[in-house]
């Protein structure tokens, strides 16, 4: 399954390892990982609470508020689920049956896919918001709010279908050590797949990632061009200050650009770590580092959003 890990930010923690290998002996890695999960859960909980309070208090929502709130919810659920699974990876075997294993790994796979898709959608929305009135994208500004909810529902169903193969391939870890099993955790394992099925699934994941990341890159480049053009125009208007609306849009765009850049860098880093794992298949340390790297984006992203939200303290104070 190393090909799937290489092509997808939605790995199944598959790792060909001996049952005698105990990841909990690496206490430093374990403590670092659970610290990362704790920080990420706190940050995403705070960001989600902020958007809920913002909605309850009747503040005028922005186009990006729903995707940002959804992204924080996805990351919160994903990190909570990972914390639960990690106890079976790093600490002790929980003795889960096949149904629990299928449910946990399937739900995690869906959440990983939705994280990628929501991030891409957020980048495209910000490009639409920043586009000038003469642009063809400007016509989508008024249509976007009505289609966001439909897009979220459609993508949720789509990723549930894409990840449905997990329900067939995940099973409870057998009592006897079997070399052809891929161990997801101490209680859950991945059944060996045929070369054809593995190749088809890897290709689908690769196409999905190429498409979504290409959308991110194109929308990011488009926003960079617009920001540079806006800055040149501002330099020619001596003595004229930017309006608060333009300033707010510019800050939001810079936040999205920062987040997109960070996401792409983390995807590249994740691919590098995933490739290195193929060279050290029985190394628990490499496996643990990969798990840590996979959740850096979910941990850091809420703090990137909050760093530019000036209304957080005001809303919480009431």
Swiss-Prot record:
Stretches of the chain found on the membrane's Extracellular side: 1-32, 87-101, 169-206, 276-285
Signal peptide limits: none
Pfam family, one: V1R
Source superkingdom: Eukaryota
Spans through the membrane: 33-53, 66-86, 102-118, 148-168, 207-227, 255-275, 286-306
Disulfide bond residue pairs: 101-188
Phenotype upon loss of function: Mice lacking all but one V1ra and V1rb gene (12% of the V1r repertoire) show a lack of chemosensory response to a subset of known pheromonal ligands and changes in maternal aggression as well as male reproductive behavior.
Glycosylation sites: 175
GO biological-process terms attached to the record: response to pheromone; sensory perception of chemical stimulus
Keyword Membrane tagged: yes
UniProt GO MF annotations: pheromone receptor activity
Cytoplasmic topological domain: 54-65, 119-147, 228-254, 307-318
A GO term from the CC aspect: plasma membrane
Keywords on record: Cell membrane, Disulfide bond, G-protein coupled receptor, Glycoprotein, Membrane, Pheromone response, Receptor, Transducer, Transmembrane, Transmembrane helix
UniProt similarity note: Belongs to the G-protein coupled receptor 1 family.
Protein name: Vomeronasal type-1 receptor A11
Organism: Mus musculus
Lineage: Eukaryota, Metazoa, Chordata, Craniata, Vertebrata
């Amino acid at each position: 399954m190393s090909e799937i890990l290489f092509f997808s930010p939605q790995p199944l923690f598959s790792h060909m390892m001996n049952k005698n290998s105990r990841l909990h002996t690496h206490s430093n890695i374990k403590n670092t990982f659970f610290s990362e999960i704790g920080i990420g859960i706190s940050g995403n909980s705070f960001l989600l609470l902020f958007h809920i309070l913002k909605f309850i208090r009747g503040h005028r929502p922005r186009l990006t508020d729903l995707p940002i709130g959804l992204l924080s919810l996805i990351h919160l659920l994903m990190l909570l689920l990972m914390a639960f699974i990690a106890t079976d990876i790093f600490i002790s075997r929980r003795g889960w049956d096949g149904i629990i294993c299928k449910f946990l790994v399937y739900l995690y796979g869906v959440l990983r896919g939705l994280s990628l898709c929501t991030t891409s959608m957020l980048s495209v929305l910000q490009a639409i918001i920043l586009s000038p009135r003469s642009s063809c994208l400007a016509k989508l500004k008024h249509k976007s709010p009505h289609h966001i909810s439909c897009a979220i529902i459609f993508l949720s169903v789509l990723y549930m279908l894409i990840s449905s193969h997990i329900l067939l391939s995940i099973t409870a870890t057998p009592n006897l050590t079997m070399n052809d099993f891929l161990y997801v955790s101490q209680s859950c394992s991945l059944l060996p797949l045929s070369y054809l099925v593995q190749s088809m699934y890897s290709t689908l994941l690769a196409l999905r990632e190429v498409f979504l990341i290409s959308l991110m890159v194109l929308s990011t480049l488009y926003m960079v061009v617009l920001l540079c053009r806006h800055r040149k125009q501002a330099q020619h208007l001596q003595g004229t200050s930017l309006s608060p609306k333009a300033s707010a849009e510019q800050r939001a765009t810079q936040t999205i650009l920062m987040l997109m850049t960070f996401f792409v860098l983390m995807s590249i880093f994740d691919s590098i770590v995933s490739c290195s794992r193929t060279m050290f298949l029985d190394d628990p340390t490499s496996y643990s580092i990969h798990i840590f790297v996979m959740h850096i984006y979910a941990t850091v992203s809420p703090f990137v959003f909050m760093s530019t939200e000036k209304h957080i303290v005001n809303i919480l104070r009431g």
